[in-house]
């Protein structure tokens, strides 16, 4: 993918993501993995160091991905001293929905034609029977942890989250507000 460049008023050229970062805007437009999470975390930490009181804005269009990578971003957002505004554009699914819900209450946004989706953890395992069993136990613990996180973020109960996340559960912008994932439709 070619990354576009922009020229600012001073004639300086920037790649578009660096220029957006200057305005405290982070864009998540890929699935979650460790390298992507490290990049997002580094951007959050940089913005926090530059001004611990000024809002950060995260725009998300992602199908989700690695739960552990997403949880690293989630925890970093929650340790920020500044408010974090989140925006769903297109689709926030799976781990991307968790990140969307991590924004500061009242500052979690969704565009009017965007959608969200929650579901239970999925993955695979191979190896010895003992290794597979341990992986399954780990997946159950992640599922339980994510249900608690989403319950806290949305105001739903853990039991409700277990029900909603049993299968893919898609929501429109309006349904996402009703569900408690976001606060505003833009």
Q: What are the residue ranges of the model-derived segments?
A:
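Terminal-region recognition feature
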Residues: 1-186
